[in-house]
Curated annotation (Swiss-Prot):
Organism: Synechocystis sp. (strain ATCC 27184 / PCC 6803 / Kazusa)
Keyword terms, alphabetized: CBS domain, Cell membrane, Membrane, Repeat, Transmembrane, Transmembrane helix
GO cellular component, one term: plasma membrane
Protein name: UPF0053 protein sll1254
Domain CNNM transmembrane: 1-179
Assigned protein family: Belongs to the UPF0053 family.
Source domain of life: Bacteria
Entry keyword annotation includes Cell membrane: yes
Length: 346
């Protein structure tokens, strides 16, 4: 009878370890594995190697688990036949099945999931060693299963999961509310385009390049913008962009006879379909704060500032000189009114 108890114990122990190891390896976050591997801990490095190619280590664990369950059940059945009467064999088989399910599967997998990181680090090196031993058998299984499992690799995470984790982290107190909002807004950068963020042409402040500083003095002083668009005869004929500070400095120095165009700097142009994340990179590379947005026909659709793009991340930025909190919204309303006057449905 002692032989049966010992055999059952060995089967449950082996099956439990395999189930626990499998659950731990699947449950430990990939980001956590990469973070741990940076410490040059041998177990962490082994764990990263396992997660990089999971099919063989998991195949090894599954093979071992089945060896314990199948061979163990056969051995236990043979021993039970010697010591138990036929009438008790059905009851014994039911009890053995229940023990394997509870102590060989459910409890070990629950523990493996709950303490995934610690268990995964503990078993990483032994699993790699066992994988080498069982390589021929696992390779054979791979060749049989490849036609059914071959396909595009599924990404380890996606945008929706990261957003959800940010929200979950905020609710659990791991990150602050403003940090959660910032993470959520980052993903808007590749969803929004220049046309969504720009100040449309109907509300753009601009000056004619042919006029002198003296002629535009009042307009320059009253302008609320630090950068002013300079055009030729029409708004689509952009000559450049002038800094209000440069214009005022020239006026103070008695250079009112100069034309606005003389003080204009070259303008940078971007298509209205450019994504916000690309725009941000453009602003960084060009070291500009204002760019002209052009439509598909090459006409001026509006202007966009670095602040417009940054506000996607931070929310509305309003300083002491701002008279209108949302120029884009005002511009949209004006554009709809103009279209209505012309009999065109907005």
């Amino acid at each position: 009878m002692l032989e049966i108890v010992a055999a059952i114990f060995i089967v449950l122990l082996g099956s439990g370890i395999c189930s626990c190891a499998e659950a731990a390896l699947f449950s430990v976050p990939l980001v956590k594995v990469r973070q741990l591997s940076q410490s040059n801990n041998p177990s962490a490095i082994a764990l990263q190697a396992i997660r990089h190619r999971m099919n063989r280590p998991i195949g090894t664990i599954v093979v071992l688990n089945n060896i314990f369950n199948i061979v163990g059940s056969i051995t236990i059945g043979a021993l039970a036949t010697k010591h138990l009467q036929d009438a008790w064999m059905g009851v014994f088989s039911g009890i053995l099945t229940l023990l394997i399910i509870v102590f060989g599967e459910i409890i070990p997998k629950t523990l493996g999931e709950r303490y995934a990181t610690n268990i995964a680090l503990l078993i990483a090196i032994p699993v790699r060693f066992l994988t080498l031993i069982f390589t021929p058998l696992v390779w054979l299984i791979e060749q049989i299963t490849n036609p059914f499992t071959h396909g595009k690799r599924v990404p380890s995470t996606n945008e929706a999961e990261i957003k959800f984790l940010a929200t979950l982290g905020y609710k659990e107190g791991v990150i602050e509310g403003d940090e959660e909002q910032m993470i959520q807004r980052v993903f808007q950068l590749n969803d929004l385009m220049a046309v969504d963020l720009m100040t449309p042409r109907v509300i753009i402040t601009y000056l004619l390049g042919e006029l002198t500083l003296a002629e535009c003095q009042q307009d320059i002083i009253q302008s609320q913008h630090t950068r002013i668009l300079i055009v030729d005869e029409y708004i689509d004929e952009v000559l450049g962009i002038a800094l209000k500070q440069d214009l005022l400095t020239a006026l103070i120095q008695g250079e009112g006879y100069k034309t606005i165009a003389e003080l204009a700097r070259p303008a940078q142009f971007v298509p209205e379909g450019m994504r916000a994340d690309k725009l941000l990179k453009q602003f960084q590379e060009k070291r500009e704060h204002l760019m002209v947005v052009i439509d598909e026909y090459g006409g001026v659709a509006g202007v966009i500032t670095l602040e417009d793009v940054v506000e996607v991340l931070t929310g509305e930025i309003v300083d002491e000189t701002d008279k209108n909190i949302d120029l884009q919204e005002i511009a949209r309303k004006k554009r709809q009114a103009l279209l209505k006057q012309r009999g065109v449905a907005p």
